[in-house]
Amino acid sequence: MDKLRVLYDEFVTISKDNLERETGLSASDVDMDFDLNIFMTLVPVLEKKVCVITPTIEDDKIVTMMKYCSYQSFSFWFLKSGAVVKSVYNKLDDAEKEKFVATFKDMLLNVQTLISLNSMYTRLRQDTEDIVSDSKKIMEIVSHLRASTTENAAYQVLQQNNSFIISTLNKILSDENYLLKIIAVFDSKLISEKETLNEYKQLYTISSESLVYGIRCVSNLDISSVQLSNNKYVLFVKKMLPKIILFQNNDINAQQFANVISKIYTLIYRQLTSNVDVGCLLTDTIESTKTKISVEKFKQTGINNVQSLIKFISDNKKEYKTIISEEYLSKEDRIITILQNIVNEHDIKYDNNLLNMRDLIVTFRERYSYKF
């Protein structure tokens, strides 16, 4: 919103100066909210008349769009004259034209984002009731699983809730904003503050394309040295995954994915319970973090459920992002060494090549760390 405000101010300043000079009329007071509503109505019309607005749109298309934008719709020039944005553009020198086109283009792109946020904002409010209901059902299933004393009893719980689990997974995997909606249930700021919604959208929106790519990458891991555990949980997952629409529509081998996930789970459990280096790393991290996090602050806040915990983290996210970042960066080399040793020991390959954990982690950090 701050960027849009700057772009809007630039657009208004250039427009007012030229309109007043050319007509001899004085501009009216500026009402940004009023004008943004006009732009939000205008953008779909411009896209229908000219073309879809994208970051790669050509400048001549932007200039064409200027012909359809009449200043008399905006607060600062309301009903004063029939001048269009292109008439101001025509009066500028080449350098000013280039800057004006860039400003107008970026403003339209930001308005487009605002339209998307408004739509998501409305859907968030509508969908939270369903998500609350789903969340309660999920917690109920988890509670029954924890209370199960045998593998057969746990399997029965999963079987009894098979339809709900499949329908919920299909819902989650078909909606790139589902994770965002779950957070909105616990953090009301997403409903009341659009800037917070935009910030969280950058973090927690996961596209179907990204999911499919990630699933394929995991499926293609070669972890043949780890024995497959065909327990009842794995069998349940194997029966369930082929019914997931994302797997059906993208021709993903559900059995292969389930096998790899089972092996990864087995490997992680084994490392957490028997790898001395992993144990030392976790202990050192916990001890180091204790010196940076105030236990008293937790107590004073009165955190007693998931909702209050998420709200606390949201209110203090800048502080905790800094702590996590410092902890990770100070231990990155150690983490990479431990992971590479595990890869080497178990001969874990991707595309017939041994995984290079340093390349993988550094690439991920460079591409995606800005999100966190």
UniProtKB/Swiss-Prot annotation:
Free-text comment on this protein's domains from its UniProt entry: The N-terminal domain is not required for crescent formation but is required for virion formation.
Keyword field: Host cytoplasm, Virion
One term under GO cellular component: virion component
Primary residence: host cell
Organism: Variola virus (isolate Human/India/Ind3/1967)
Localization per record: Host cytoplasm; Virion
Protein name in the entry: Virion morphogenesis protein OPG132
Transmembrane segments: none
Cross-referenced Pfam families: Pox_A6
Protein function: Lipid-bound viral membrane assembly protein that plays an essential role in immature virion (IV) to mature virion (MV) transition. Functions in both crescent-shaped viral membranes formation and its enclosure to form immature virions. In addition, participates in targeting mature virion proteins to sites of virion assembly to ensure their correct localization.
Keyword DNA-binding on entry: no
Family: Belongs to the orthopoxvirus OPG132 family.
